[in-house]
C-alpha cells in the first residue's frame, strides 16, 4: 500500500479540475510534524504562480474537488496554501489488517525490470580491505530491496582480473617454483605480490620476462591462462568467505571481471573510428568530448587505445555498458563505485550514448559514496598507517560484540552467545555504514556503532526482540488473533499505524535513489513510535480483550516490518538478546 502515491493521484486530479495543467505536481509529502497531519500537499505554490492566482485561493478550489472520503478524517489548508491531510483511523485499521494478511506486508510489486547492479569489485591477488566495504554492503542492500520489489536483478561483481600485474605474478611464482598456485592462500599471494613488484622494479631481466608473459597471457597461451585462472580462483574463494561473513548475497556466479570484455575492445575502437567519434592523436586513439573541457577550455580528449595498442579502463567500461544493455538486456544499470570515479564514468557513458550503444531510455546511474574515516577525520587506517583488511575488521567486530554480549548475558550457553555476537558484531559494522547518507564521508567509531541506544544495529535488534517478548508474555493463539479486528482510537495507535503503512513508500525511495539510510531512518523512527505506544497504550493489561488483541496486532505488524526492513539491509535479527 503506497498511501503517498494514492493521495498524489487524488490531489492531482482535484488540481486539474480546479484549472491546473495536466502535468501539475501535487508534491504530496509525509508531514514532518504530527500537527500538520500525516501528509501535506505543497504543490499549490508553483501551480498558482503559473495560473496567476494566490496559492491559498487555488488550495480552496482544489478542496472543492478533492474527494478523500474513507481515506482522510480531516483536510485543512495551512499557511500560504499547504493542504494538510489527516488519515482516517478506520482507513488505517483496514490497511493494517490487510498488511498482516499478506506475506509481503501489503507491499505491491511495480512493473518488473531487469536491473544490473555493479558492486564490490575487489582486485585479484589482493585481500579485500575496508575500501571495499561500502560498495559491497550498500550495493547488496539495493539488490535485496529491488529483488523484494519483484525486479530481476543481475549482480555484477566487476573484479579487477586483468592487467600487466599478472605477467609479473606468474613470473615470480615460477621463479619460486610454486606453480601449484591452487594450494596458496590469499594472504600468501599478497606477500608474493609485494615481492614480485620489488623484483619487477629492481631486476630488468625479470621485468622483461614478466612483460613477455603478459603478451603470452593476452594472446591466449593455455599454460599462462591456466596460471591466471588459479590466481583468480584463490582470490574469489577467499573473498567468498568474506561475503558469507558479511551476510552479502554475492556468489562466484556473479563475477563479471574486466577480462570478460577483452574480446569486445578491438571492435569497439574500430566502430568508434568508423562513426567518426574516435581519431588518431599523437599515436593514440582518442575521443574528444565537448561536454568536458581541459584547462585550456578545449574539448577533453579521452584515450581509448594507447599508441602501444593497449586499452584503458575507459575502453573496458564502454564495452561493459554495451554488454549490459545488449547481452543482459538491462532496463537500468546501477554502479556502486566511489565518488572519485565520477568523471571517469561520465566520460565513458558520454561515449556510450554518442555511439548509440545504450539508449537514453536505459538509465546508467552512478550511486557514488564517500569515504570511511577514522576518528581523526582522515582515511581509516591501521595504527601503523597501513590499509585495514576487511577480514581483520570483522574479526575485531566479532571480538568486541562477544565481550558486549557476554557482559549482558553471563549465563548464556557458548554456542548461543557466539551466534548472537556474530549477528550483533557484523550487524553493527554494516548498519553504521548503511545508516549514513552514502554520498557523504563518515566516521568509523566502534563505541557508537556497538551502543544499545541511538540509530545502531544493536538498538534495532533489541527493539525487535522487545516486540517479540510481548507475544511470548501474551501466550496468544495466532489463529484467534488473525480473526480479531484492529481498532484505532488513541493518537499513539494512529501514529504507529500510519508509520507502519509507510513501509512501501520507504522501499520505493530506496529502490529509486539507492539510499539505504532512508530505510534505517524509517526503522529507527518506527522503533521509537512503538516504544511510545507500548508505554502509553497498555497491551497485556488493556481494558478489554478487544483492545488487547488490536494492540497485539499493531505490535505484530511492527515486528514483521522491523524484521523485513532489516532483512532488506542484510542485517540479521535474533529472537532474544
UniProtKB/Swiss-Prot annotation:
Localization per record: Cytoplasm
Principal localisation: cytoplasm
Q: Which CDD domains match?
A: Anticodon_Ia_Arg, ArgRS_core
From which domain of life does this come? Bacteria
**Annotated GO MF terms:** arginine-tRNA ligase activity; ATP binding
One of its Pfam families is Arg_tRNA_synt_N
According to the UniProt entry, what is the EC number of this protein?
Answer: 6.1.1.19
Which keywords appear in this protein's UniProt record, sorted alphabetically? Aminoacyl-tRNA synthetase, ATP-binding, Cytoplasm, Ligase, Nucleotide-binding, Protein biosynthesis
Report if keyword Ion transport is assigned. no
Choose any GO biological process term that the UniProt entry carries and state it: arginyl-tRNA aminoacylation
Can you list the GO cellular component terms from the UniProt entry?
cytoplasm
Q: What does it catalyze?
A: tRNA(Arg) + L-arginine + ATP = L-arginyl-tRNA(Arg) + AMP + diphosphate
Membrane-spanning parts:
none
Positions of short motif 'HIGH' region:
122-132
Describe the subunit structure.
Monomer.
Q: Which family does it belong to?
A: Belongs to the class-I aminoacyl-tRNA synthetase family.
Put simply, this protein is called: Arginine--tRNA ligase
The species this protein was found in: Escherichia coli O1:K1 / APEC
State the organism's lineage: Bacteria, Pseudomonadati, Pseudomonadota, Gammaproteobacteria, Enterobacterales
Amino acid at each position: 500500500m503506497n498511501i503517498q502515491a494514492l493521495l498524489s493521484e487524488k490531489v492531482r486530479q482535484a488540481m486539474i479540475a480546479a484549472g491546473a495543467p495536466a502535468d501539475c505536481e501535487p508534491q504530496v509529502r509525509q508531514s514532518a510534524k504530527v500537527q500538520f497531519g500525516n501528509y501535506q500537499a505543497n504543490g499549490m505554490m508553483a501551480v498558482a504562480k503559473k495560473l496567476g492566482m494566490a496559492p491559498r485561493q487555488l488550495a480552496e478550489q482544489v478542496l472543492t474537488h478533492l474527494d478523500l472520503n474513507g481515506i482522510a478524517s480531516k483536510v485543512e489548508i495551512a499557511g500560504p496554501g499547504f493542504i494538510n491531510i489527516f488519515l482516517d483511523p478506520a482507513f488505517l485499521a483496514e490497511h493494517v489488517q490487510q498488511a498482516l494478511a499478506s506475506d509481503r506486508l501489503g507491499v505491491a510489486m511495480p512493473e518488473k525490470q531487469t536491473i544490473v547492479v555493479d558492486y564490490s569489485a575487489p582486485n585479484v591477488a589482493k585481500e579485500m580491505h575496508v575500501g571495499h566495504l561500502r560498495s559491497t554492503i550498500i550495493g547488496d542492500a539495493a539488490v535485496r530491496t529491488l529483488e523484494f520489489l519483484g525486479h530481476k536483478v543481475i549482480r555484477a561483481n566487476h573484479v579487477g582480473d586483468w592487467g600487466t600485474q599478472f605477467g609479473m605474478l606468474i613470473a615470480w611464482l615460477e621463479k619460486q617454483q610454486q606453480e601449484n598456485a591452487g594450494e596458496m592462500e590469499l594472504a600468501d599471494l599478497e606477500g608474493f605480490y609485494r615481492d614480485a613488484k620489488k623484483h619487477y622494479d629492481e631486476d630488468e631481466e625479470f621485468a622483461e620476462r614478466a612483460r613477455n608473459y603478459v603478451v603470452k597471457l593476452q594472446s591466449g597461451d593455455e599454460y599462462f591462462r591456466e596460471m591466471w585462472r588459479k590466481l583468480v580462483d584463490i582470490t574469489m574463494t577467499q573473498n567468498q568467505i568474506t561475503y558469507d561473513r558479511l551476510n552479502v548475497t554475492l556468489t562466484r556466479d556473479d563475477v563479471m571481471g574486466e577480462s570478460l570484455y577483452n574480446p569486445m575492445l578491438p571492435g569497439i575502437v574500430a566502430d568508434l573510428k568508423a562513426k567518426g567519434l574516435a581519431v588518431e592523436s599523437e599515436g593514440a586513439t582518442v575521443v574528444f568530448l565537448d561536454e568536458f573541457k581541459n584547462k585550456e577550455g578545449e574539448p577533453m580528449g579521452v584515450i581509448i587505445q594507447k599508441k602501444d595498442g593497449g586499452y584503458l579502463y575507459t575502453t573496458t567500461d564502454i564495452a561493459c555498458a554495451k554488454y549490459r544493455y545488449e547481452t543482459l538486456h538491462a532496463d537500468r544499470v546501477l554502479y556502486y563505485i566511489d565518488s572519485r570515479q565520477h568523471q571517469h564514468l561520465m566520460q565513458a557513458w558520454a561515449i556510450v550514448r554518442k555511439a548509440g550503444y545504450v539508449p537514453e531510455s536505459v538509465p546508467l546511474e552512478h550511486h557514488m559514496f564517500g569515504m570511511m574515516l577514522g576518528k581523526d577525520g582522515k582515511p581509516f587506517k591501521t595504527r601503523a598507517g597501513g590499509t585495514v583488511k576487511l577480514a581483520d575488521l570483522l574479526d575485531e567486530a566479532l571480538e568486541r560484540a562477544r565481550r558486549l554480549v557476554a557482559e549482558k548475558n553471563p549465563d548464556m550457553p557458548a554456542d548461543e552467545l557466539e551466534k548472537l555476537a556474530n549477528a550483533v558484531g557484523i550487524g553493527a559494522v554494516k548498519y553504521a555504514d548503511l545508516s549514513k547518507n552514502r554520498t557523504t564521508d563518515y566516521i568509523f567509531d566502534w563505541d557508537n556503532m556497538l551502543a544499545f541506544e541511538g540509530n545502531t544495529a544493536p538498538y534495532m535488534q533489541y527493539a525487535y526482540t522487545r516486540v517479540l517478548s510481548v507475544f511470548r508474555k501474551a501466550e496468544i493463539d495466532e489463529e484467534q488473533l488473525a480473526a480479531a479486528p484492529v481498532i484505532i482510537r488513541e493518537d499513539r495507535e494512529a501514529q504507529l499505524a500510519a508509520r507502519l503503512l509507510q513501509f512501501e513508500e520507504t522501499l520505493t525511495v530506496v529502490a529509486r535513489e539507492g539510499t539505504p539510510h532512508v530505510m534505517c531512518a524509517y526503522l529507527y523512527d518506527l522503533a521509537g513510535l512503538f516504544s511510545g505506544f507500548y508505554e502509553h497504550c497498555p497491551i497485556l493489561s488493556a481494558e478489554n480483550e478487544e483492545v488487547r488483541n488490536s494492540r497485539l496486532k499493531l505490535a505484530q505488524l511492527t515486528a514483521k516490518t522491523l524484521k523485513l526492513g532489516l532483512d532488506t539491509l542484510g542485517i540479521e535479527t535474533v529472537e532474544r538478546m
